[in-house]
From Swiss-Prot:
EC number, as in UniProt: 2.4.2.9
Function: Catalyzes the conversion of uracil and 5-phospho-alpha-D-ribose 1-diphosphate (PRPP) to UMP and diphosphate.
Magnesium recorded as keyword: yes
Organism ancestry: Archaea, Methanobacteriati, Methanobacteriota, Stenosarchaea group, Halobacteria
Protein known as: Uracil phosphoribosyltransferase
Pfam families associated with the record: UPRTase
One function term, GO molecular function aspect: GTP binding
Cofactor note: Binds 1 Mg(2+) ion per subunit. The magnesium is bound as Mg-PRPP.
Biological or metabolic pathway of the protein: Pyrimidine metabolism; UMP biosynthesis via salvage pathway; UMP from uracil: step 1/1
Source species: Halorubrum lacusprofundi (strain ATCC 49239 / DSM 5036 / JCM 8891 / ACAM 34)
Catalytic reactions of this protein: UMP + diphosphate = 5-phospho-alpha-D-ribose 1-diphosphate + uracil
Family: Belongs to the UPRTase family.
């Protein structure tokens, strides 16, 4: 398992995850490569969740030559992935390669950039659309957003998820890059969530962007800059 437990989050340390993130950070990485990189990173993170949080069971297997015993991952039918539009779309595409039978939810959420960041480091959040599947007590819920900056968007999203879910097996908040400020805000607001990230960066700038970060993941993936 390549997940390192930190006080503020669980850090995914897989070599391919770090390699892919480094390419995503590079300003020279163009749109198609950036989008494919987010897909790849989502797939790697999905495999890490399977390896670190899911159990296996022994099953009989008939090979072409004889019967033997194999292992299957338990709970792959009991996964709910929440896509925080829009930047998470390619990230979630990768997660679905690891969890092809997962149910999907969608929440469209974004900062009110015109209002700006408050003195306590939060943004007003606008949520335009929410569509969630049934969340059952046996489900593993993964809320995916590649950037966890101030944590304002994620906290607003988690409010909706928790309103719909009376119980669940596990709740993961998954990001590619996180700021320390956002990790603290989310962990204090939703202590039952397990925070997973590939990198914990230095800080937020005065506009609430992660430094060094990788820029605006949505703009780079969808070429809206």
């Amino acid at each position: 398992m390549t997940i390192e437990d930190r006080d503020d989050a669980h850090l995914i340390t897989h070599a391919l995850a770090k390699d892919t993130l480094s390419r995503l950070r590079d300003v020279e990485t163009e749109q198609v490569a950036f989008r494919k990189g987010l897909v790849k990173l989502g797939r790697i993170c999905g495999y890490e969740i399977i390896d670190g949080a899911m159990e296996t069971e022994y099953v009989p297997v008939q090979t072409p030559l004889q019967e033997t015993t194999g292992e299957r991952v338990k709970g792959l039918d009991d996964v709910v992935i929440i896509n925080v539009l829009r930047a998470a779309t390619p990230f979630v595409e990768g997660l679905l390669k690891a969890f092809p039978r997962a149910k999907q939810g969608v929440i469209s959420a974004g900062r009110d950039e015109e209002a700006g960041m408050t003195d306590d480091g939060e943004f007003p959040i606008t949520i335009d659309y929410v569509k969630l599947p049934e969340i059952r007590p046996e489900d593993t819920v993964i809320v995916a957003d590649p950037m966890l900056a101030t944590g304002s968007t994620m906290c607003a999203v988690l409010d909706h998820v928790l309103d719909e879910a009376d119980a669940f097996e596990d709740l993961f908040v998954l990001s590619a890059v996180s700021a320390p400020e956002g990790l603290v805000r989310v962990s204090e607001s939703v202590p039952e969530a397990d925070l997973l990230t590939v990198a914990i960066d230095d800080r937020l700038d005065d506009d609430g962007f992660i430094l060094p970060g990788l820029g605006d993941a949505g703009d780079r993936a969808f070429r809206t800059v």
